[in-house]
């Protein structure tokens, strides 16, 4: 079964894969952040949002994985095998948990649309050859200040006057000034 945990939120595993693995904070830091910001909502018996629900599930699954890791560490006598299990969990499963935690915390903090916009912006930035892209990657917390959102549909272009014609001081100009004063 190929299940994408981001699908219902408008994202995908592929979209998050553009972010390098060292981009994501540690699971411990992310869990501390989730607890500090959303403890009441996460512990509440009431349904808040799908992101809260997903965050609850990720936290519970991480707890179960840590219980399994503790059991393996206690019951596996061969140190080399123990190290292999720990390495596998940290490399593969740890990254998935860090991505999930980061995504849902970010969506709750910044809003889903902004996080998706950030993921797309970063994906475009990282795939652009270094010679043609800005030196700094997009930053999620500053995205609203720097992003130009273009609305779909036909854009209206103003024609600039040709250099041969001088713009006359016609009544049209005075009308536009009077419109401004009505606002």
Swiss-Prot record:
Write out the ranges of the annotated region (2 X 8 AA repeats of S-P-R-R-R-[PR]-S-Q).
162-177
Q: What is the name of the protein in this document?
A: Capsid protein
Xref: SUPFAM superfamilies? Hepatitis B viral capsid (hbcag)
Q: Name one GO cellular component term.
A: T=4 icosahedral viral capsid
Q: Which InterPro entries match?
A: Hepatitis_core, Viral_capsid_core_dom_sf_HBV
Question: Could you cite one Gene Ontology molecular function of this protein?
Answer: structural molecule activity
Subcellular location per UniProt equals: Virion; Host cytoplasm
Q: Where is the composition biased (Basic residues)?
A: 151-176
Family membership noted in the UniProt record: Belongs to the orthohepadnavirus core antigen family.
Q: A biological process (GO) annotation for this entry?
A: microtubule-dependent intracellular transport of viral material towards nucleus
């Amino acid at each position: 079964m190929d299940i994408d945990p981001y699908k219902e939120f408008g994202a995908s595993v592929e979209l998050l894969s553009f972010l390098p693995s060292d981009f994501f904070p540690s699971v411990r830091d992310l869990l501390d952040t989730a607890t500090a910001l959303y403890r009441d909502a996460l512990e509440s018996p009431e349904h808040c949002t799908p992101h809260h629900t997903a965050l609850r599930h990720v936290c519970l699954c991480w707890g179960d994985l840590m219980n399994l890791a503790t059991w393996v560490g206690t019951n596996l006598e061969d140190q080399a095998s123990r190290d292999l299990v720990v390495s596998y969990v940290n490399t593969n499963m740890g990254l998935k948990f860090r991505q999930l935690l980061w995504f849902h915390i970010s969506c709750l903090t910044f809003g889903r649309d902004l996080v998706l916009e950030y993921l797309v912006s970063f994906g475009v930035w990282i795939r652009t050859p270094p010679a043609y892209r800005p030196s700094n990657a997009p930053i999620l917390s500053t995205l609203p200040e720097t992003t130009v959102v273009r609305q779909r549909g036909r854009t209206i272009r103003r024609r600039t006057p040709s250099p041969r014609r001088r713009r006359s001081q016609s009544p049209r100009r005075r009308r536009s000034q009077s419109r401004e004063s009505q606002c």
